[in-house]
Amino acid sequence: MKKILYAAAMTALMASPALAENIGVSMAKFDDNFLTVLRNGMQDYAKEKDGVNLQVEDAQNDVSKQLSQIQNFIAQGVDAIIVNPVDTDATPAMTKLAVAAGIPLVYVNRMPSDNPLPAKVSFVGSNEVDSGTLEMQEVCKIMGGKGNILVLMGELSNQAARQRTQDIHDVIAKPECAGIKIVEEQTGNWDRTQGTDLMTNWISSGVQFDAVVSNNDEMAIGAIQALKAAGVDLNKVIVAGVDATQDALAAMKAGELDVTVFQNAAAQGSGAVDTALKLAKGESVESMVWVPFELVTPANMEQYLSKN
């Protein structure tokens, strides 16, 4: 009789669905066009996987709140944690928490400052050396290697902003772009409104420029709005951004944005979940999982219209 009951129990266990994988996700903030696409990419991918549950939290651009969310995920005993860092300089503390708890950790989109990453910790994103380089090389080409540019930087606490800005400096240091001069360089914190405000101030100050090179599309769109409000002929100004968001591509289609760089937010999102699941199962993954950047111009923009 015991053998029959044991066999029945084993049959029922084998017929039951696999144990659910619970993943805690802390996003830097929800109120951001690009990060919304990234978050949707995670959630859409998770829906395709049986038994995968995502608990997605908004850190509201607050490092303390993000650390608290990670601590809560650990207390809940999640199988893995995904973090889109508010401040990439704060990642060593986050890594320490996850490693001490023995929980796999995946950083997404914003590269952590930890180097190298310990076991069971990975980064999924795009190589920022490529983003600003592709952007500025195209701007240099359009400008014929000479002229004045304005640079809109993202949040300075963010590795992506620092690297994209460095990329711009590296490109104009090359002989073919040596005639290009940066006349203003300020942070707009990735924000469209701040991009508008900075551009308005530069126009009012009488700064002479030929191009606006932004660390992201949101600030570039803000600059475009300010240029239009001031009656500046956009055919005489080059505007460039990074991300290839839907709003940016609409601006490009309207002839207002000249250059952007496609950052595959959805692929980063799905890649982060896939990497977290593999780590939770004890599988081996690369510490750096790269999703390539791609240059977008009016000549090839049509193929990107439905991607971000």
Where are these regions (language model features)?
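A residue-level marker of the well-folded mature domains of exported/periplasmic proteins
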Residues: 3-5, 13, 19-308
